[in-house]
Amino acid sequence: MNIRQAKNEIKHTVEAYLKKDEAGDYEIPEIRQRPVLLMGPPGIGKTQIMEQIARELGVGLVAYTITHHTRQSAVGLPFIREEEFAGKTYSVTEYTMSEIIASVYRRIRDSGQREGILFIDEINCVSETLAPTMLQFLQCKTFGNQKIPEGWVIVAAGNPPEYNKSVRDFDMVTLDRVRYMTVEADYRVWKEYARAQHISGAILSYLELRPGNFYRVEADVDGMQFVTARGWEDLSNLMAVYEKLGFLVDEQVIREYIHHADVAEDVAAYLDLYRKYQDDYGIPQILDGCVRPEIYARIYAAAFDERLSVVHLLLDGLAAFFGRAASERALTDAWYAFLKEYRRQVETCLLYTSDAADDLIGV
């Protein structure tokens, strides 16, 4: 499935797990609420869809990348306490609350959201000392001897072994206790997200011409070469700021985000061509309604790649115009609401002052 399908299925799962009957009990008992295990390549938006699901459902979200944790922070620190057994006192080992479980309780306390999603990323890339804890977590929904609070749905994500050398396979016993989903990179789905996030028109134009370069992972003698959706989005954000500052985005800069030599070189060449088209066609003048006659003849005779680039240049300019218009409208609406409330308060104050004056003179 693609990332959009995965989002919808996880969202449906959370809604089903949190559905209650007339008595206020969960329709699916907690013991039957299997954790969701989402496996897919890195950088395709697994964490982002969890944020979207939590926001759309109005539930809490606690997200952790488990590779950043040690066994002590995940399970808790040991301490000694005394207990009496059969008339004798013994020293026994107890554990402090898991940092992850404590974060869930803090979220409940601070937000008032008693239901939510506990998202654990890179769950199959943990260290050898933490691996048994993760198996216990998926099988029993506990960290150490502490359970996940009721009403919190577990979603875990990991990478297939071809993307990460430190991946550990789950055994059949664990897989039989989870909902296993496999997600793949899909440019058509990402393109919808990219438009909503105002990803650079130059990048979208390039990927329309080279969709095969959207997501690539290859191993050669020089090591791993890869391109991910995250890389395209982060590069786009940098390009937007560099353009405002007047800085050039060259091949060296692109290689810092696109870790594939051939693709980075190809993108750099295309960006140079994209900028040339912007100057040659006079895109700002076209958007102002001033089109030179020779422009029609040139675009008519142009190759498909050139036409597509010009279309994206025009769309980029329109998007910037619409963005400015939306910002100005939002600012106007905010000022209108402020002045309306200010006027109401002034009228209330004047009315109160008038009534007080009347009372004072006995009218």
What are these model-predicted stretches?
Residues 1-205:
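AAA+ P-loop NTPase catalytic core and its hallmark functional loops
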Residues 91-93, 229, 359:
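Conformational gate/switch positions in structured elements
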Residues 197-254:
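Conserved AAA+ ATPase small/helical "lid" subdomain
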Residues 255-351:
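Extended alpha-helical coiled-coil/bundle linker/stalk regions that scaffold oligomerization
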Residues 352-359:
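Conserved small/polar residues in nucleotide/adenosyl-binding loops
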